[in-house]
């Protein structure tokens, strides 16, 4: 009898525990104080935000042209509009992908719109999802707590 009670409690707990909640990432640009190359989380004034997707990745995009440098820190899902994201998104840094057909059929004369994404001469994407200093899942969702609370009476009735 105890075996069945423990089995039911374990199955209930497994059903109620969801994936870890969304990853936390810093979301800022180098125009924000503290978000440049020398990062200072106290300067940006917050500890990051939840990414909207459950399997998201934190990204740091560094774009350079001459002495000018722009750094963007965000979730990968928020940058999904970009066409130069490298195919390999595993932990680490790599150069931006180059799309030969990007804006090939566009008759566009306003260079500030940068439809060809060629304003910056050097673009690097750094992906981060394993390093706890970069981000961290906030643990189990509240349904896991509810599952544990329902498991405790089952174990106490033994």
Curated annotation (Swiss-Prot):
Membrane-spanning parts: 137-157
Sequence ranges on the Extracellular membrane side: 23-136
Any one GO CC term of the record: side of membrane
Propeptide: 136-158
Pfam families the record matches: QVR
Subcellular localization(s) per the UniProt record: Membrane
GO BP annotations listed: liquid clearance, open tracheal system; regulation of synaptic transmission, cholinergic; regulation of tube size, open tracheal system; rhythmic process; septate junction assembly; sleep
Lipid modification (GPI-anchor amidated asparagine), residues: 135
InterPro entries: QVR-like, Sleep_regulator
UniProt topology in membrane: Lipid-anchor; GPI-anchor
Record's signal peptide: 1-22
Glycosylation sites: 107
UniProt keyword Membrane present: yes
Keyword annotations of the record: Biological rhythms, Glycoprotein, GPI-anchor, Lipoprotein, Membrane, Signal, Transmembrane, Transmembrane helix
Coiled coil stretches, renumbered: none
Cytoplasmic face residues: 158
Keyword flag Electron transport: no
Knockout mutant characteristics: Conditional RNAi mediated knock-down in tracheal cells leads to aberrant tracheal dorsal trunk development resulting in tracheal tube size defects. Conditional RNAi knock-down in tracheal cells compromises epithelial paracellular barrier function in trachea due to reduced and irregular septate junction formation.
Function noted in UniProt: Required for septate junction assembly possibly by organizing the preassembly and transport of septate junction proteins. Involved in epithelial cell septate junction-mediated paracellular barrier functions of trachea, hindgut and salivary gland.
Family of this protein: Belongs to the quiver family.
Protein name: UPAR/Ly6 domain-containing protein crim
Record organism: Drosophila melanogaster (Fruit fly)
Gene: crim
